[in-house]
Amino acid sequence: MISRSLFARLLLAPLLAPPALGSEPGTMLAARVVEAAYVGTIAPLPPGAKRAEVWIPLPSTTPFQDIGDMKISTPFPATVEKDSAGNAVAHFTVEDATMLGGKEIEVRVTFRVRRAEVRAPLGRAAYGAPAPSKVPPDASPWLGENRMVPLTPRVRKQAAELAAGRRDAVEKAQAFYRYLVENGTYDKTTPGWGKGDSERFCDVKKGNCTDFHSAFMALARAEGIPVRFVIGFPINPESEGTVPGYHCWAEFWAEGAGWIPVDASDAAKSGDPEKRRYLFGNLDPDRVELSRGRDLTLSPKQKDGPLNFLIFPYVEVDGKAFSETKIRLEYKNA
């Protein structure tokens, strides 16, 4: 495997240039620093494959995580671009698939992350009186529909019923959160889970983190509240380990406070009332963000339609999506 780390670091500098940690509203308390490695494995390409393109999500610095010392290892030269939601993405091309000799492809992104706890100021005095008509330009893209998150008459009716009597974005979002936490079941056995299909979740009220937060997105957006989808990895409290799967959460926007996090699926899994209260407006530092957004257009643009969300390596073989990929996050406390 050929390391492209120096080339990638030079390209990453302008793409990952951060706002100051904690520059958005909210209070940072606990923090955690870990050395991490995102490992993506792509199964052997199908017989007869000629050309493949691969896109890899890269962690970015945000107001609540600092990313440093990033190194990208790929079997072919990679460039770093931004997708339609502003996520940093590494891209490389396999011009001749026979060069792989029927073997799998492994990509590895190592980095150091300082992740801070998020505590949003949920008091009314901090928020003022949010008004959907005053949504700032950078929040407006998060108001519309996604393919898996349509704003149907049913969801608009349900959102209006849940929001009745609520005075502002925070109270409405809290009503949606409580409804999902109290009525939803975290479940990865019922067919159709994991796609982030909000209509399915409304029908069965079961699913994983993607499904819970898609339902939250639909309800909040139906009431004119911007919501963005965030996906990454959970990090166990232990000092080191390997995480074989992703985790996601959401952030809604309220005037006077900015983006406020919610983790409805973790709350639904917990029977602890205090944890359920905490996960509306607060996040522990035991997670790493990889990307944001749904229906993503990558760079260079993929051929097989918008990408539902980005956490796995995205692969196109001769212009068609190839989904036989796996991920894991290896980490240890720094």
Give the positions of each predicted feature:
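Active-site nucleophilic cysteine motif
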Residues: A169-F176, K205-A220
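N-terminal export leaders
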Residues: I2-L11
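Hydrophobic h-region of N-terminal signal peptides that target proteins for export
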Residues: L12-L21
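Hydrophobic/aromatic-rich core segments of domains that either
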Residues: S214-Q302
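Intrinsically disordered, low-complexity N-terminal segments that are enriched in acidic
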Residues: G22-R119
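Sec-exported extracytoplasmic/periplasmic mature domains
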Residues: P46-P47, P59-P63, R114, A160-R167, ...
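Acidic low-complexity segments
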Residues: E106-Y186, G192-D203
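Low-complexity, Gly/Ser/Thr/Pro-rich intrinsically disordered linker/tail segments
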Residues: L283-A334
